[in-house]
């Protein structure tokens, strides 16, 4: 019995990351999603993957057909109600590091360390007591509750030409960890049966 408990305990310790898996948020970017809405033919999509265990947040954006040239892009948080309204900028200002500026179409892919002050708008950190951990928790809560949106600003629409509220598309699957857990449980059951027999 002791071997069974140890085997299951060991397997659970190896799959701890599966219990705190990265979470993926996605959105469709459009002028109709702005507040107030605009008639821009611009369109795009964004994926934000946040890993609470490593404090890393990957931002992937693709956009095209903007009327104006890009001037900035960032994540705003947290609106009063999910999926509606406006909020201040949560991530770094004036724009994401390396975001393509002065263009009407492009792609972007960057990973931020959310345990660093440089990943945030200082006003967002100040609003959360000056604490990085509280700021990270607030942004994570805003993402999970649908109260955060990614905005692409342009010369024609300084308040934002296209945006979209980020919605949870579920944790990133970690099949290796789950397979290991299944294997350990199978081994534990086999040991238990042999011992009982």
What are the language-model segments listed below?
Residues 12, 29, 178-181:
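Generic leucine side-chain signal with a strong bias for well-ordered alpha-helical environments
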Residues 17-19:
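Bacterial Sec-dependent signal peptides at the C-terminal "C-region" and cleavage site
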Residues 194-197:
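Short, charged juxtamembrane terminal tails flanking transmembrane helices
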Residues 173-191:
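A short, hydrophobic C-terminal helix/tail in secreted or cell-surface proteins
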Residues 7-15:
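Bacterial N-terminal signal peptides
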Residues 1-6, 192:
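Bacterial N-terminal signal peptides that target proteins for export
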Residues 21-73, 77-171:
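Metal-centered catalytic cores of metalloenzymes
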């Amino acid at each position: 019995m002791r071997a069974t408990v140890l085997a299951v305990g060991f397997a659970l310790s190896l799959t701890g990351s599966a219990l705190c898996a990265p979470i993926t948020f996605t959105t469709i970017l459009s002028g109709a999603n702005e507040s107030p809405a605009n008639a821009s033919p611009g369109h795009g999509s964004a994926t934000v993957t946040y890993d609470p265990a490593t404090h890393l947040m990957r931002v992937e954006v693709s956009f095209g057909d903007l009327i104006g040239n890009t001037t900035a892009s960032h994540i705003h948080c947290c609106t009063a109600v999910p999926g509606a309204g406006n909020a201040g900028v949560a991530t770094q200002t004036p724009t994401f590091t390396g975001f393509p500026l002065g263009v009407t179409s492009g792609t972007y892919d960057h990973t931020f360390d959310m345990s660093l002050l440089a990943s945030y708008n200082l006003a967002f950190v100040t609003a959360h007591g000056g604490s990085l951990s509280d700021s990270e928790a607030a942004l994570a809560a805003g993402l999970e509750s649908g109260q955060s949106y990614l905005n692409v600003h342009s010369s024609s629409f300084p308040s934002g030409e296209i945006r979209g509220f980020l919605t949870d598309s579920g944790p990133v699957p970690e099949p290796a960890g789950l397979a290991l857990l299944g294997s350990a449980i199978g081994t534990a059951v086999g040991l238990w049966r042999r011992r009982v027999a």
